[in-house]
From Swiss-Prot:
UniProt enzyme class: hydrolase
Keyword Glycoprotein listed: yes
The protein's name in its UniProt record: Snake venom metalloproteinase ACLH
EC number from the UniProt entry: 3.4.24.-
CDD domains according to UniProt: ZnMc_adamalysin_II_like (cd04269)
Disulfide bonds: C304-C384, C344-C368, C346-C351
UniProt organism field: Agkistrodon contortrix laticinctus
């Protein structure tokens, strides 16, 4: 008994290495078991909320102690954020849950100026962070010890499919000449634009996740949490206006032909979704395997158009941020961005608007994307992204459980 107790204490105090494990993110060849310790100070006598606005965790990565600083992503949800699903007889059910006390965070690693983090703290810590130039994933382990987490490098996750994955947008536009060079675009937060996004989840996704709507919503929330961080450097603020789950059946003809699905989705958005939810852009998340290597498709330079401010994204990976980057890529097309060429750069990393998803996880938009996005905004002046949406943390929200049933 004493020997068992000593072993347990040692495991709780020190991380240990594992050679191979199957996690939610996939098969991992090399991982580290860690026990993140929350060190956020709480004033004496104060009641500690479930999710603070700011938190700090100590953990060990590669045997070295690090401090993870997290701040709640307060602008993640729009004021009138809604969730819609469908009953077995096809009735539309819409709720307006209170989301100001949510569990999604951005952050950084202490003493690493180039570090970033996008973390869900809903059930343990789950997400990704960049440390000393390398991307790491963290997720809770399903052990009797609920504090145990796995930390592993992105490169140590076995690839689900070695075939290249691409965006279906082709370079068939007219010759493009930007109005300014990057050095001439001296933008600041006075130029900020605001995109309110609705993510629609098809019936195949509902089946793929075994009808677990909460798990689907958490998947989408974490995706948008990552997208918001990527767009922050572009002076584009992303907020989630709604999640709609086609829990009964698909409301459009979802096909492996991505262009057909995109056209169908855009038409449905114009005649249906826009009349129910105020938003600027809609993205369809589907379990359908698109033809060929395509994992996403969107119209170019169409933000604010009733039909064309849309994209379709295949749920192509168990790693959340890879699907999030794909959705950020497709929305980038809506904002006028083209695919990066060899002359484009984003600080030595793989860029979000690369036409091919590389093994080096994309993190940033390139200098080309920056110019193209703001060239589109300055020339076309899309009106719907000018207004700053009210945030859920600054206004009252409908009472939990408010529900609308529609025939």
């Amino acid at each position: 008994m004493i020997q068992v107790l000593l072993v347990t204490l040692c495991l709780a105090a020190f991380p240990y290495q594992g050679s191979s494990i199957i996690l939610e993110s996939g098969n991992v060849n090399d991982y580290e078991v860690v026990y993140p310790r929350k060190v956020t100070p709480v004033p004496k006598g104060a009641v500690q909320p479930k999710y603070e606005d700011a938190m700090q965790y100590e953990l060990k990565v590669n045997g070295e102690p690090v401090v993870l600083h997290l701040e709640r992503n307060k602008g993640l949800f729009s004021k009138d954020y809604s969730e819609t699903h469908y009953s077995p007889d096809g009735r539309k059910i819409t709720t307006y849950p209170p989301v100001e006390d949510h569990c999604y965070y951005h952050g950084r690693i202490q003493n690493d100026a180039d570090s970033i983090a996008s973390i869900s703290a809903c059930n343990g810590l789950k997400g990704h962070f960049k440390l000393q130039g390398e991307m790491y994933l963290i997720e809770p382990l399903e052990l009797s010890d609920s504090e145990a987490h796995a930390v592993f490098k992105y490169e140590n996750v076995e690839k689900e499919d070695e075939a290249p994955k691409i965006c279906g947008v082709t370079q068939n536009w007219e010759s493009y000449e930007p109005i300014k060079k990057a050095s001439q675009l001296n933008l600041n937060y006075q130029y900020q634009r605001y995109v309110e996004l609705v993510t629609v989840v098809d019936h195949g996704m509902y089946t793929k996740y075994n009808g677990d709507s909460d798990k689907i919503r958490q998947w989408v929330h974490q995706m948008v949490n990552t997208m918001k961080e990527s767009y922050r450097y572009m002076y584009i603020d992303i907020s989630l206006a709604g999640v709609e789950i086609w829990s009964n059946k698909d409301l459009i003809d979802v096909q492996p032909a991505a262009r057909h699905t995109l056209d169908s989705f855009g038409e449905w958005r114009e005649r249906d979704l826009l009349h129910r939810i105020s938003h600027d852009n809609a993205q369809l998340l589907t379990s359908t395997d698109f033809d060929g290597p395509t994992i996403g498709l969107a119209y170019v330079g169409t933000m604010c158009d009733p039909k064309l401010s849309t994209g379709v994204v295949e749920d192509h990976s168990k790693i959340n941020f890879l699907v999030a980057v794909t959705m950020a890529h497709e929305m980038g097309h809506n904002l006028g961005m083209r695919h990066d060429t060899g002359s484009c750069s984003c600080g030595g990393y793989s860029c979000i608007m690369s036409p091919v998803i590389s093994d080096d996880s994309p993190k940033y938009f390139s200098n080309c994307s920056y110019i193209q996005c703001w060239d589109f905004i300055m020339k076309e002046n899309p009106q719907c992204i000018l207004n700053k949406p009210l945030r859920t943390d600054t206004v009252s929200t409908p009472v939990s459980g408010d529900e609308l049933l529609e025939a």
